[in-house]
């Protein structure tokens, strides 16, 4: 009977601490379901499809895009995203070399379960129309230019450092008979040849029920989940979707020889304006990912060898006066076999040749293992795993269950071994030195490797520009006017088909989620008198019994945890602007510096680091002054603060405070250590200058903020000159530099500049307040007449930069084949501004998947991404267009749509407005997704912004009340100025091929357009290779 055919048989049930991992299979179809109950507000789901390809056409990647564009039951593009919005949910997808994951999340169970069958239909029975292929994958427009969302995304991969390196590594490490050899994203040259028929064939081959697993994490009712999954199986059977008897499961071929017969060394070039630094990568083929114990041991050894300032690789290559690279690390890709990879980032060119031999020699000559440090590291690794289970259980279990589905037994036999990390950690604690040396010898010394050296090349960028221009001219001549006209008409019709208006009844049939059903996590908060009005709860009563000689600013958030997170936030407003640029060096320096731990003789930095790592689970010293690509979120802040965050076990609470004190107040200045830090940071800058994600916010930082702001002082474009000067001064007169750093530290050690946040089981902490006295009493200066400082970037904003005539700067980016654009306008400066709900709603509306802007920009292949971002902390609004083949047309199309919405020519759908409001519920549910997230958000609201703890929930009610008229008025005030030639500031990072055309187009729009190189913007000369390092001679 059908009912029997739709049932599920449990094949696995495993327990890890408080988590139970369950997995079931439907025998009639092979469709499987896995579930882990996690204490999170949001439910996460993923349909995982094991995908293998033996060409560079990109079928796995294109399907990831096309499956969203209509299905058999819901045959119109956009219905899936409309339903997801009404469920307070998000949908996404990603493609790796061995699987494609279709991801969804929702703020409450009912909406999540209603969305699952809709998503499943799109995955199992997609339309895969010619029109969707045209706009989403590849097309030639009426100007003869190549475009398409997938094509634009993959275009940059042909010349960027990371992509050309991985491309060479992949084709050198694996034989052509392996699916790992190929680019599943699709090479642009191959995407030109791809057809929708080929994609349909690939879907039929791979997207069979037995090759799909639904993984769900969160507070899910498993009975309801299985009932929903049975409904999906019923549809599978009714539609005759079967796994053919002759079907071959991906990645199960045993005919591939993965042996690397001899060491391989290859060199590749990538596009870059600066030719100062490159990268070196090594790879070995390891054991099967299903050999979980060996893989865990290899990962442990790799991290032990590289992930610390006192690790062998760190000491040899990074933590020296003249470093070989800015960062060195291992990564193990979980495949069959695994790929064990070693990366050296930002390597000065004069040090790049022979670096791989140094690395291989270090591995071969390792005859001893520091077993004391290994013992400490295994304890730390166990604690880190436990903290990840607390903070990020969904992502951890998703990774394991995905691996199990792609490679493991379909009867669940491999799953128990993949979940035994804590047991493996315990077993490794029993290993002797000879066991680690044996592992090292087998997989790194006696095992052949592949090395790829990636070198920067400005000539390559120029050649690409020339080749693209020649191809375009050739294409135009070949097609002729009539051919181009036909292509333009084809694209137009495809867009019209993809953007057909959805039925009102169809959209409304999927009811909107009830916000009252959303579960938000909340901590129990208490605080000292300096931090604000006390709360009325048992935690407040408990901390009030602890008498402190000082009145520190501390907020406590009580949650059920075996660990304690200590965070110290330091307001930097008292530091003179002349010293603020040094903060980046200070933050990195104190993580691994000599210190006065006792007495007057400094403890060497390597001993300090060893003790620190022994006593703590994690350490993070950070400055969060920027967000990549100007993608600011309205709720973010802390841009003018230095933070020191330490996580410890509960019994080490006092040690956590002790280490914050040592890092902040007891580190001592050492010339060699400081030079090492400076040179590491200098080596990173060429890499950052090749990436628009760094350059875009950096440009606005130096234009919109004065030199008192960290945004101005610490961004990529400002730091290069500062670091060069600091390096020169340190070599010639280090005492004056040490005096400057000490002076800067004294400004930070002001009682009123420090705010403290403690998260954990507060009721089990002895002396929760007075423990901090050793830091605050003995090290901090107190001014009784001074209030606690509260500084935001908006305090340093230069509003005059938004002049009467718009300034648009075009920055040539040889490393990119596409362009990025950001426009900025004055924004609001308070989280209580009555306009904020309207602005957030507008930003949500602009970003709706398959909404009007999505269809106009991404749906037309004009850009891969776009968004409106809100920086309340900095007082600025941004409109961003990312990875665009035609940035002017993307901007102009956005402008035309905004004007049409304001005029009423294009109607604002009530359903889209509802979905935009639901996005805000999704955002807040993510901010309070679990107890730790909720605690951090509580501190931000109460102790940074000075708001009430329930302010986010009040804000949701305000968003809910925004009317259509308020929305339209908001578009005029807060969106239309992005498209004016006055009162805004803009920057474009342009591919070389598009500069002239872009300048001409925006000039015609009335903009004052300037083309400036990065060196011109920075006001510095290009540095010669001889100047890049301190040491010159490289004989070590």
From Swiss-Prot:
Organism (species): Schizosaccharomyces pombe (strain 972 / ATCC 24843) (Fission yeast)
Highest taxon of the lineage: Eukaryota
Gene3D superfamilies: Metalloenzyme, LuxS/M16 peptidase-like
SUPFAM superfamilies: LuxS/MPP-like metallohydrolase
Gene Ontology BP, a term: mitochondrial protein catabolic process
Cellular-component GO terms for this entry: mitochondrial matrix
Pfam families documented for this protein: Peptidase_M16, Peptidase_M16_C
Protein name, entry field: Uncharacterized protein C3H1.02c
One GO molecular-function entry: metal ion binding
Coiled coil ranges: none
